[in-house]
A protein has these predicted regions:
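Polysaccharide-binding surfaces and accessory modules of carbohydrate-active proteins
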Residues: 1-144, 159
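OB-fold single-stranded nucleic acid-binding module
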Residues: 57-61, 163, 181-189
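A residue-level signal for beta-strand positions that form part of recognition/binding surfaces
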Residues: 129, 170, 213-215
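Acidic/glycine-rich phosphate/pyrophosphate-binding loops and surrounding catalytic core
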Residues: 132-140, 145, 177-207
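Pocket-edge structural micro-motifs
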Residues: 134, 156, 175, 180, ...
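Short acidic, Pro/Gly- and aromatic-enriched capping/linker segments at domain boundaries
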Residues: 146-166
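Short Pro-Gly-centered flexible turn/kink motifs
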Residues: 163-182
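An acidic-aromatic substrate-binding cleft motif
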Residues: 186-240
Length: 240
């Protein structure tokens, strides 16, 4: 079902699946961004029945394989998450070994804590690629595997999900965004993704990008030997 979109240059569809036996309803809301060759979707599960739903677990919001015309190596470009160190958000690149799954997930229940940020770039041997983003503030996972020298697979969703829904209860999954790019330089894909985020994922007020305050704190006891009590002065706090 095509539905009206409130956003400019965005098309929107709603796909609905319903099981009359147990009353489980699944809705997939899809957004398309034609100017950026991007698609985004999220799943919603609703129990329309009169008793608890069957168990929902291991839901893969994306479970996809793509085959390219050229043979060769696939490269994964991603960034470190937050370790409270000078290496936070450091860019990383790995060549995917055929048949070995690269598993990515954050730590501590936070979407960007640990070794990975929730978006990454897959570069194919064909001078094409896809950037995948996971929209989730909790613990997500993403598995990427070079099935052979032409095929790449990816799966992603909520890492820990085993639950049931009470009658009339609803839950949503992480959202998934795929943006496709084509260029011999994979940085063209990164820059296209930045433009996509600015155009469609950045808050604007009266047509202008929102300006947020710079802020800092001492909750991680640094720089050593400082803590929030031993070094902080009024002037220092104002400067921070």
């Amino acid at each position: 079902q095509k539905i009206e979109s409130e956003e400019a240059d965005v098309i929107k569809y709603l796909f609905t699946y319903y099981n009359p036996t147990n009353g489980l309803k699944v809705e997939c809301t899809v957004k398309g961004y034609p100017s950026y060759q991007a698609a985004e979707w999220v799943l919603n599960f609703t129990n329309k029945g009169t008793s608890n739903s069957p168990t929902l677990e291991q839901v893969k919001v994306v479970d996809l394989a793509m085959q390219y015309a050229s043979k060769g190596e696939f490269k994964l470009h991603y960034a470190d998450g937050n370790h409270i160190s000078k290496y936070d958000f450091h860019p990383r690149s790995v060549t995917l070994a055929t048949g070995e799954t690269k598993q990515m997930s954050p730590q501590g229940g936070r979407s960007s804590e640990g070794d990975y940020l929730p978006f990454f770039n897959i570069e194919s041997p064909a001078g094409q690629g896809v950037i995948l983003g996971v929209g989730w503030s909790g613990t997500w996972y993403a598995d990427v595997c070079a099935q052979d020298n032409r095929t790449i697979s990816m799966a992603s969703g909520m890492k820990t999900m085993k639950l049931y829904l009470r009658p009339q209860e609803t839950i949503r999954t992480p959202s998934i965004s795929l943006m496709f790019w084509e260029n011999i330089d994979r940085m063209a894909g990164h820059n296209k993704f930045r433009r996509f985020v600015l155009a469609h994922k950045s808050r604007k007020i009266n047509g202008k990008f929102a300006e947020y305050p710079l802020s800092s704190g001492f909750n991680y006891r640094d720089p050593a030997p400082c803590t929030e009590y031993s070094c902080l002065t009024a002037d220092y706090a104002i400067a921070m």
